[in-house]
Amino acid sequence: MKRRDFSLAAISAATVTGLPVAAQAQGPAAKKPVEGTDYLSLDKRVPTDVGAGKIEVIEFFWYSCPHCNAFEPQFAAWKKAAPKDVVVQRVPVRFRDDFEAQQRAYYVFESLNLVEAMHGKLFHAIHAERQQLNTAQALAAWVGKNGLPEQKFIETFNSFGVASKARRATQLQDAFKVQGVPALGVAGRFYTDGSLTQTMDRALQVAEYLIGEVRRGR
């Protein structure tokens, strides 16, 4: 979903139709990615949080985005199978102020080591159960029904650590010039998304190509 399309009407229509990005019609056999068409090189490198010899791949996402929901199972499998020299991070975007609650919710899960337990559940609650979970209060009530005490969620949600991570996420989003989600950033140097590649299947192929380029010293 492109950044300019994040209106309630667009979200509602997309949710109804499902719009499974990874299931869109595939084109011809994969060809070598083309810079400027399949991916973009950043004008300024973005510092990464990984050590020497490691390659960072970032998924930019938003819980209420139907495309991100459709992509999540595929990306989770890709993340699990990533080579040892690839460090995969998820970064929730904040295109508008009302995105902040869900952005912070992800970092609450991360801080409490609950991403694996809660990340997919939150997507499911929003897109399959059609729950409106876009405020701190609504999210706190939801986690309270899913094994995390509301007070613990609220305390962590309002903590300095979560606020700092959310601020850093927005900085990364801006540094990569994210125009829509889901999107991928590679090695602090490259950016691709479904608008460039037409499908997120292809975006993952492009990310793998770029990982190879980084390994080869590009």
Could you say what each language-model-derived stretch is?
Residues 61-64, 75, 79-82, 109-113, ...:
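Sec/Tat-exported extracytoplasmic proteins
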Residues 81-112, 116-143:
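Structural microenvironment flanking redox-active thiols in thiol-disulfide oxidoreductases
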Residues 5, 145-218:
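C-terminal cap of thioredoxin/glutaredoxin-like
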Residues 64-67, 94-98, 125-128, 161-162, ...:
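Solvent-exposed loop/turn segments at secondary-structure junctions
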Residues 2-97, 212-218:
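Extracytoplasmic thiol/disulfide redox context detector
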Residues 56-59, 70, 74-77, 100-104, ...:
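Extracytoplasmic/secreted proteins, especially bacterial periplasmic and envelope-associated proteins
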